[in-house]
Amino acid sequence: MLSVRVAAAVARALPRRAGLVSKNALGSSFVGARNLHASNTRLQKTGTAEMSSILEERILGADTSVDLEETGRVLSIGDGIARVHGLRNVQAEEMVEFSSGLKGMSLNLEPDNVGVVVFGNDKLIKEGDVVKRTGAIVDVPVGEELLGRVVDALGNAIDGKGPIGSKTRRRVGLKAPGIIPRISVREPMQTGIKAVDSLVPIGRGQRELIIGDRQTGKTSIAIDTIINQKRFNDGTDEKKKLYCIYVAIGQKRSTVAQLVKRLTDADAMKYTIVVSATASDAAPLQYLAPYSGCSMGEYFRDNGKHALIIYDDLSKQAVAYRQMSLLLRRPPGREAYPGDVFYLHSRLLERAAKMNDSFGGGSLTALPVIETQAGDVSAYIPTNVISITDGQIFLETELFYKGIRPAINVGLSVSRVGSAAQTRAMKQVAGTMKLELAQYREVAAFAQFGSDLDAATQQLLSRGVRLTELLKQGQYSPMAIEEQVAVIYAGVRGYLDKLEPSKITKFENAFLSHVISQHQSLLGNIRSDGKISEQSDAKLKEIVTNFLAGFEP
């Protein structure tokens, strides 16, 4: 083969019309042909080696993984509920994704189909669309990056301030802490509202229900509580700080916007997260929002911090859950609610807890709100939530329209565990006040029928009227605990018994201004000691007496 190629090369090198070829010319042609063949051989060897290395690299770097997805198809869609065929291995409460990009959650796992609730507008889904599993249970972003933001039930920002920067996510349906990690409530959660902090005190880790008819001031108590935490969050002591989560369920968008503006004006948004599932959102989002907010609060609790979560209100969550359950063909029970509506709220509220020091010592306090119809607390949802929580603040329409605001019914309101967390100073001044007010309400009902009352009854009525006036408080004006103690001291010790009831509010404003400007050291002692010492008691008595002597109503 080699000789043939050499001969061909020599022939090409010879002149075409050569008569006689010299030996030198023939020799040089042969040498040139041999050199050409050697260079070609070297090129072939180099190309083969390079090709082999490229192929080897590609084989070693090839992605051998196979991307498998379990999919199903929509059988029917309507009223926010999709019936999906396939998805045989889907989990309960797993997130699924429709071909339109919408997300949903599998709730009903039936033999031949899966009932999926849609998180959004079901008009974007049609029969026959592909649905794929995500393999993930519904989760939301958590962390301090959410503070100051307004998010929807899935944790997506809806305040126009860009995406959430949180890298931590947490499942929305986590189990509540067990018995061992918990410890009894022992630290006060101050609302800044005199009537609450003195009569129905709340502790960190407690669940205190706010219940009443519409337009009786339920949300106002919650918002005042958030605003009052500014005095603690402005400090540097992490143990005193209280991060707040407000969950708006089924409210008007304008109402949520006003609330966010109010918190922003009070400089309270910097430590608050607002989770909004408004009336125009799908029922599944209204159902999910409280659990999403709770997961955000649990992040603080489990990291040794303190958080407060307000569910406003759980009546609307129960209605959304009833709607979903009936559309999923689950059997209805009392008031058409499904049989597990108690579990709906208990598994949510049990996640509020005070953790012991081995588990970080954090806490999550819950203030659920329930709206009653015509003051009926014996309805299904109110009785359920009353039995789950550690007490309730009961607001009455009648008191509200009488001008007693906050319109708290002292007789029906109770805090089952909060007294252990109440500051000693407040216990010293307000210990007898609840009994006095309850007796006053009872006697006042009979006093209108008779005029000849004995001196003790007249004294009880006189004191009750003045204490009721003293507990009135304007909206968005929470008070520090030491200021509350100073004002209530004047009332329960009888210094205001001679003052006209109509002058009580004026006295309170003037007295507080005087104490704050002239006796800051006394307030500081009460705040730091947590109690009224003998010296502080004597000083308070002197201040009240001297102020009343010069007070001109």
Swiss-Prot record:
Protein name in UniProt: ATP synthase F(1) complex subunit alpha, mitochondrial
Compartments where found: Mitochondrion inner membrane; Cell membrane
Quaternary context: Homotrimer. Component of the ATP synthase complex composed at least of ATP5F1A/subunit alpha, ATP5F1B/subunit beta, ATP5MC1/subunit c (homooctomer), MT-ATP6/subunit a, MT-ATP8/subunit 8, ATP5ME/subunit e, ATP5MF/subunit f, ATP5MG/subunit g, ATP5MK/subunit k, ATP5MJ/subunit j, ATP5F1C/subunit gamma, ATP5F1D/subunit delta, ATP5F1E/subunit epsilon, ATP5PF/subunit F6, ATP5PB/subunit b, ATP5PD/subunit d, ATP5PO/subunit OSCP.
Acyltransferase keyword on record: no
PTM-bearing positions, type N6-acetyllysine: 123, 126, 132, 161, 167, 230, 239-240, 261, 305, 427, 434, 498, 506, 531, 539, 541
Ligand binding (Mg(2+)): 219, 312
Entry PTM: Acetylated on lysine residues. BLOC1S1 is required for acetylation. Acetylation of Lys-132, Lys-230 and Lys-498 is observed in liver mitochondria from fasted mice but not from fed mice.
Phosphoserine: modified positions: 53, 65, 76, 106, 166, 184, 521
CDD domains: ATP-synt_F1_alpha_C (cd18113), ATP-synt_F1_alpha_N (cd18116), F1-ATPase_alpha_CD (cd01132)
Modified residues (N6-succinyllysine): 161, 167, 230, 239, 261, 305, 427, 498, 506, 531, 539
Site (Required for activity): 413
Residue list for modification Omega-N-methylarginine: 204
Primary subcellular site in the record, as a coarse category: mitochondrion
GO molecular function per UniProt: ADP binding; angiostatin binding; ATP binding; ATP hydrolysis activity; MHC class I protein binding; protease binding; proton-transporting ATP synthase activity, rotational mechanism
Residues that coordinate or bind ATP: 215, 217-220, 473, 475
Keyword Transport: yes
Additional record remark: The siderophore enterobactin (Ent) produced by enteric bacteria binds Fe(3+) and helps bacteria scavenge iron ions from the environment. As a consequence, the mammalian siderocalin LCN2 plays an important role in defense against bacterial infections by sequestering iron bound to microbial siderophores. LCN2 can also bind iron bound to endogenous or nutrient-derived iron chelators and plays an important role in cellular iron homeostasis.
Membrane topology: Peripheral membrane protein
NCBIfam families per the UniProt record, alphabetical: atpA, PRK13343.1
